[in-house]
Swiss-Prot record:
InterPro entries: Ribosomal_bL28, Ribosomal_bL28/bL31-like_sf, Ribosomal_bL28_bact-type, Ribosomal_bL28_sf. This is Large ribosomal subunit protein bL28. It comes from the Bacteria. The gene is rpmB. One of its GO terms (cellular component) is cytosolic large ribosomal subunit.
Length: 96
């Protein structure tokens, strides 16, 4: 299980701790990942995803998982999220 968000691709970054004396030591900045269950209205199913807190706020802001995935750039999504996006697009095409 990698330390990256399945929806936004946000991952581990590296940097420095900087002391008062300006000494620099290497450190990692980890994303705030949460295991959440999101519901797809189009598919009528629940999906368990590992997403960052920022991505969770973005999903809520866009109006749900379906709207987020349809608007998201496919290159940033994980393989699971890409498959989910394709299923939603297919289901929307059938309904139209």
């Amino acid at each position: 299980m990698s330390r990256s968000c399945e929806l936004t691709g946000k991952g581990v970054q590296s940097g420095h701790n900087v002391s008062h004396a300006n000494n620099k030591t290497k450190r990692k900045f980890l994303p705030n990942l949460c295991n959440v269950t999101l519901i797809s209205d189009a598919l009528g199913q629940r999906f368990r995803l590992r997403v960052s807190a920022a991505a969770l706020r973005s999903v809520e802001h866009r109006g749900g998982l379906d709207a987020f995935l349809l608007k998201a750039d496919e290159n940033e999504l994980s393989m699971r999220a890409r498959l989910l996006r394709r299923q939603i697009v297919k289901k929307a095409a059938e309904a139209a």
